[in-house]
Amino acid sequence: MQAYQRDFIRFAIDRGVLRFGEFTLKSGRTSPYFFNAGLFNTGSALAQLGRFYAAAVVESGIRFDVLFGPAYKGIPLASATAVALAEHHDRDLPWCFNRKEAKAHGEGGSLVGSPLAGNVLIIDDVITAGTAIREVMQIIKDQDATAAGVLIALNRQERGNGELSAIQEVERDFGIPVVSIVSLNQVLEFLADDEQLKQHLPAVEAYRAQYGI
């Protein structure tokens, strides 16, 4: 685990974004942990989050021309990542996002920001069912651009109804990498090393054994 990944897990726990307990997911599963990126909800938290995303971008080695943030949650994530790449990695890259509903007046259209062209890196928080990413892939295709990959905050490493996770299905169906700041494996590693949080390790390991990929 890289230092920035360990720092990100600590940051997520401190912000209440990553919590441990008993949570019912949309899938109906009872999970021993929950990740809510909406709680990165202050200026300083968003700035710090952007730096973690930027570190993961650099670490991934994915070559791309523009960042894309899917509405709505991906919009601040893509903008924060673009700022952090410019300020901390000397990479001043364009970024773009979509509107949920196309605008008929003013500049019009459903895209805001830089033109969506070339190789596109999609920035989002998590991939649960993969539905939102499939919609984004169509937007990119409609602009004659190419998806270069997807970057998310947490890979739950959890299968859906079949044998694959939603992330693996996206990788298979579109032939692109999906990378994350951290994965559940790294969260487990963090728990094992933390005396205060170690109590949650057995429940998370049991969940991973039952639903993991």
Swiss-Prot record:
5-phospho-alpha-D-ribose 1-diphosphate binds at residues 26, 72-73, 99-100, 103, 105, 124-132. Orotate binds at residues 34-35, 128, 156. CDD domains: PRTases_typeI (cd06223). InterPro entries: OPRT (IPR023031), Or_phspho_trans_dom (IPR004467), PRibTrfase_dom (IPR000836), PRTase-like (IPR029057). Its cofactor is Mg(2+). GO terms for molecular function: magnesium ion binding; orotate phosphoribosyltransferase activity. Transmembrane segments: none annotated. NCBIfam families: pyrE. Belongs to the purine/pyrimidine phosphoribosyltransferase family. PyrE subfamily. Homodimer. This is Orotate phosphoribosyltransferase. It comes from Pseudomonas syringae pv. tomato (strain ATCC BAA-871 / DC3000). The lineage of its organism: Bacteria, Pseudomonadati, Pseudomonadota, Gammaproteobacteria, Pseudomonadales.
